[in-house]
A protein has these predicted regions:
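N-terminal secretory signal peptides
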Residues: 1-35
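Secretory/extracellular carbohydrate-interaction modules
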Residues: 41-110
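Ligand-recognition surfaces built from glycine- and aromatic
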Residues: 42-68, 72, 165-228
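Surface-exposed coil/turn segments at beta-strand junctions on protein surfaces, enriched
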Residues: 44, 96, 125-127, 138
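Hydrophobic residues embedded in beta-strands of well-ordered beta-sheets
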Residues: 101, 111, 141-145
Length: 228
């Protein structure tokens, strides 16, 4: 979809498409094969995954709540089960709200929990840089999703303890996590021409003994140069 089409979408339609990416596309892909394990090695099972994200904004438009960006994280190669969605510059649950950030916990295609920071400003600085870390972990028989170390000119610091959701789980490891699933389902959902870069910069894998490995391969989901 090109930038012109995205910029012409209504906010309601953009929200529908964002929700559609987590309720339709992954399920359509889930037949493709067995779960691909995440760095499961002799050191021990993976019980925590951290994804470092970077966003470079071009020229935002606060009047149209654009751009809107979403990242997704799940314990396996399917969204049939529990997973988390992180919305930036517009919360979609339970109804659309302008600006800010929102972490959502889903079960299949049903929303279960949400949490947000207290700053609901819309993105309004040109060339703004946003950084944050998405965390998924197993703690005390619970699957925990969290946003930490967030920074933004528009929103200030976020992910300082206020953005954490948890749910009981039968899982005792996260070996089924696959970064390709994250990148396939995370995207700039509205006004992509207002985003210069959206990149998953690195991934850290932890066992009960601590840090197992770090994947420093940058995964560029979106890149746009208005001069080209």
């Amino acid at each position: 979809m090109n930038a012109q089409n995205l910029s012409g979408l209504s906010r309601r339609e953009a929200c529908r498409r964002l929700l559609g990416l987590v309720s339709v596309t992954p399920l359509a892909m889930s037949w493709q094969g067995a779960i691909q394990p995440a760095f499961a090695d002799a050191i021990g099972n993976t019980i925590r995954v951290e994804e470092d994200w970077y966003v470079k904004i071009g020229t935002p438009d606060p009047d149209s709540d654009s751009p809107q960006i979403t990242s997704v994280i799940a314990p396996g190669w399917t969204l049939s089960g529990k997973y988390a969605v992180f919305d930036m510059n517009g919360a979609t649950q339970p109804d659309f709200s302008s600006g800010g950030v929102q972490l959502q916990l889903w079960s299949n295609d049903s929303i279960r929990q949400t949490c947000s920071n207290t700053n609901w400003a819309s993105l309004h600085f040109a060339n703004e840089e946003i950084r944050y870390t998405s965390v998924m972990s197993i703690q005390d028989d619970e699957l925990v999703f969290e946003i930490i170390n967030g920074s933004s000119e528009s929103w200030g610091a976020f992910g300082t303890g206020e953005m954490k959701l948890r749910v009981p789980t039968w899982r005792n490891h996260l070996n089924g996590y696959d970064p390709s699933f994250t990148t396939d389902n995370s995207r700039v959902g509205f006004a992509s021409h207002r985003v210069r870069n959206f990149t998953l910069e690195r991934i850290r894998y932890y066992s009960a003994d601590g840090l197992k490995s770090t994947d420093n391969t940058p995964r560029v989901l979106h890149q746009y140069d208005p001069q080209m």
